[in-house]
Amino acid sequence: MITSPPNEQAGSWLGVFALALAAFIFNTTEFVPIGLLSNIGQSFEMTPAQVGLMLTIYAWVVSLMSLPMMLATRNIERRKLLMFVFGLFVVSHVLSAIAPSFAILLVSRVGIAFAHAVFWSVTASLAVRIAPPGKQVQALGLLATGTSLAMVLGIPLGRVLGEALGWRTTFLGIAAIAALVVFLLVRALPLLPSQNSGSLRSLPILFKRPRLMAIYLLTAIVVTAHFTAYSYIEPFTQTVSLLSGEMTTILLLVFGGAGIMGSIIFSLFSDRFPNGLLITAIGTLTLCLLMLLPLSGDAVTLGTLTIIWGMAIMCFGLTLQARVLSLAPDATDVAMALFSGIFNIGIGGGALLGSVVSSHLGVANVGIVGGLLALGGLGLCCYTTHHFGKVRPAAEMQAESK
């Protein structure tokens, strides 16, 4: 039986909650521009497709810097590291709010991306580490709930605030909330010396694990497919579905709420049906993307599709995150830095592909292109599942990594 010091055990769920709140802030700021593309574009006399490239730049900076930043900070005590990360985060948001040009806005987003690169390299492993014994899957689920709430509350409220008071106010609001989160992290987290972070010597070892490499490839394909459509959901709903700004905000709320439902589904079924859950999630996502245009004419039908879509992408992300942690218990931070980097390659690639599709084929076709790409991911998933055989339950693998 694994035991912890009384004070650490008592505060373990509070620590996980604090990390989930931090995840809420980081995911809110990464994706809030999706709901503000038109407003930001008007400020700098740019089209939504042009402004959308800030999503690509942000994501690709994260992807390039996740591993180098993790290695550079691998010996720093984790609570102190999070304080530095949030300091950079807050300062960069203030710069975003006062940016006089799109170029300065991009510079500020790069600063946020550096903070993001470090945060997501260590957070999942920290949540698992401080969770009560036997509650690692639930800890990941709570972390995912913070991510989902960014979709439910952060992005829609950011859009509402941006439309009412300007998009700059949205970034100032995020900075203020982040400053409060810092105090909660200081109170909630125990001292967390760096542990099993790995080093450059870990890379050749990880690259020799074919199941892990397959997970990384699958991540890149499916995340690119998802963000090809999701990055341009605002102009899609307004120009193709002809929804009002208020209905678009509601649709974003629905998507985020579905993500919470997806995290619950993950917690319930990931141990018993790891392969089935992953294949079902990718298959459902593929179908939703392919049906986005055909079902875009009716608001209720589109809302239903959005719910299913949101559940599917959340189940997909959580399942792969859990597998990365279980397949690399000897180098969790390196493995998660690679996962975060590849995930963000997918985000940036999807935003870029969506921009190209919007400019040359029309924004109406982003779902079709994304769906075809997701179909390739489904084929890869089925092949690797057959090739590698049955996956052991997540709880069993996490217990072995202790």
Swiss-Prot record:
Compartment(s) where it occurs, according to its Swiss-Prot or TrEMBL record: Cell inner membrane
Transmembrane intervals: 14-34, 51-71, 84-104, 110-130, 137-157, 171-191, 213-233, 249-269, 276-296, 300-320, 334-354, 361-381
Membrane topology designation: Multi-pass membrane protein
Annotated InterPro entries: MFS, MFS_dom, MFS_Efflux_Transporters, MFS_trans_sf, Sugar_effux_transptr_put
Keyword Ribosomal protein attached: no
Keywords: Cell inner membrane, Cell membrane, Membrane, Sugar transport, Transmembrane, Transmembrane helix, Transport
Gene Ontology MF term list: carbohydrate transmembrane transporter activity
Pfam families: MFS_1
SUPFAM superfamilies: MFS general substrate transporter
Coiled coil: none
Cellular component annotations (GO), alphabetically ordered: plasma membrane
Stated family: Belongs to the major facilitator superfamily. SotB (TC 2.A.1.2) family.
Function per UniProt: Involved in the efflux of sugars. The physiological role may be the reduction of the intracellular concentration of toxic sugars or sugar metabolites.
Alphabetical list of HAMAP family matching this protein: MFS_SotB
Protein name: Probable sugar efflux transporter
Organism of origin: Pseudomonas syringae pv. syringae (strain B728a)
Lineage: Bacteria, Pseudomonadati, Pseudomonadota, Gammaproteobacteria, Pseudomonadales
Gene, per the UniProt record: sotB
